[in-house]
Amino acid sequence: MSKIDIQDNFLNPNYFKNLKNLFLSERVNWTYSDVISYENELSATKIDNFQFTHMVYFDDAPVSPHYNDLIDFINEIKVASTCKIKVNMNPKTDKIIVHGFHNDMVYKCKTGILYLNNNNGYTIFEDGTKVESIENRFVSFDSGMKHSGTSCTDQRVRLVININYFEPELHK
């Protein structure tokens, strides 16, 4: 099994609070996304398979006015090159919905998730490993590991920042 790295209290508390407040504010425009998992077999029914997204970085360029707000986050990860940054907002549901296992990227890189709020949703991996949604927790793993996000039932939304990136090469 590939390694899943979990780091709690990942960002400076004041910076994290500002980031969380930004993405919970009306200053951010959200896009409705009809499909969460790109696999043919979904755990969620079609009616439950949606989320709201805010693309921050895509196709080798910032695509959001909020990209600069994430610079300290990117630097904390020690990113050599960014592939994609997207903020996902999953609305509350009556029961936890597992949206379907997927890989974010088709090539080998790292996937990272920063949890912006506490809720009873989670990230689950194909091997059954669950990572709870705890605010200011950062989880990273090889992009080849299939995973799924969920909805939550105890908060209005489940909010995460998803980043796909290349790590710097280690020099001896």
Briefly describe each language-model feature range.
Residues M1-A80:
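Non-heme Fe(II)/2-oxoglutarate
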Residues G100-F101, K146-D154:
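Short beta-strand His + acidic residue motifs that chelate non-heme Fe in jelly-roll/DSBH
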Residues V131-S148:
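Conserved metal-binding segment of the jelly-roll/cupin
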Residues K95-G100, Y107-C109, Y115-I134:
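A short beta-strand-loop-beta hairpin characteristic of the jelly-roll/cupin
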Residues M1, R27, I124, I163-K172:
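Double-stranded beta-helix
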Residues Y67-D72, K78-N103, Y107-T111:
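Internal catalytic-core helix/loop-beta-alpha segment
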Residues G112-L114, Q155-H171:
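A short hydrophobic beta-strand segment most commonly corresponding to one strand
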